Amino acid sequence: MKTINLFKSILAIVAIALTTIIIGCSPEKPENERDKKLHEDPIRAVFTLQEGTLDNVTTFDKQPKKANFKASSVPAQVIEWQTTAGEGWHRTSQIEAFNVKNCIDNPNVVYLLKMEYYNAKGEMMNSQFYNLGQDKIHQHFFSTYKRVQYKGQTSSVRVTNKADLPYDYRYIDELNGAFIGETNPMGFDGLIKFVKPGRHFELSVDLLHAAESKF
């Protein structure tokens, strides 16, 4: 597997810095990789965060859908990364991280987080992760880590207690107009809110290619 750390920064309000980890596919026989994985490798990643509201503030804790979200007049924030042979993955957008509002001080605010991936031809390739059964083995996962001391050394440990997480996320993916966020979560479209005032943190976004079906 190949992991690429894309975003690392500090923000002002509640702050989120995305550490995006794109995990490439590694079949047992590398020479057959192109034949087996059924999708191209992305060379460009575009993450868009749009502030907005839901039709009802309680919808987030139920099962929100795209239709429940209404974008605000605040311009979307976009972070873009590309990979080249000489540099590997590097940020190409001026924005390094997202400035966000917490939902304690702003209870109606929620954000739409969209992930878009592009191939070497400049074509958006999100559909390749859905077609030919690829939806069964691909999914975004969201994590944050904390520093701990262990045997005199500092290590990073994933936060597993939901009460300690500074964010809350809901999958709202659709396929051919039908909602699949609950039965087949993908994470190309999701709603996220920030639940800890005055925090800045790094959010690890993992695009997983699994060896077996998630069902």
Predicted regions and their residues:
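Bacterial N-terminal signal peptides that target proteins for export
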Residues: K2-A12
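First exposed extracellular module after export/assembly in secreted or surface-exposed proteins
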Residues: R34-F215
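Short, intrinsically disordered low-complexity segments
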Residues: F7, E28, W89-H90
